[in-house]
Amino acid sequence: RHQSDWLAVISLDLETYVASVVGAEMPSRWHREALKAQAVAARSYALAHLARPATTSYHLGDTTRWQVFSGETSTTTASRAATLETRGMILSYGGGIVESLYASNDQVSAEAHGHLGASMSQTGAQQLASQGLPFNAILGRYYRGASLARLKRYDQ
C-alpha cells in the first residue's frame, strides 16, 4: 500500500524497460539515431535513479514526471532496435552516471531543466538526426562534457 491506495511495483530487466520508454517517449517513425540517443538517455536516467529512488517503494514512476513507461504496449520494433544497438551504453561525467534529463522540445527543456545546464530536446534530437548526426554527436550537443561509457556487465 502507498498511502491509502494499493501500489503495483514492477521489477524488470533494464533493457526491456529502456525499449518501452523509448517507444513511449518518441514516435517509432522518428530517425533511428534520435531513437538511439533516447535509449542512452533513458538508460542513464533510470540508472541514476537506482542511487536516488523516487520513494522508498520504487525507483521511478511511469509518467512524464520521470520517464513514460507503458510496458509492452509501447515497445516497438524501432524501440527494440535502438535499445539493442546501444545496449549497455550510458552517459558518464566525472566517473558517475549522468541523470540525463530530457523534454519534448527546446522550450520545455529550457523551462524545466535550463537551470541544470544539460537537457535533451527530443524534437531537437530528431532534427539533428535528420541532418545526419549520429546518436553520440546528438548526445554530445545536449550533455556537454559527458562521455559515452559501457556498463561493465555488457563488456565482452
Where are the regions that the model predicts?
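Conserved, single-site charged/polar hotspot
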Residues: 1-156
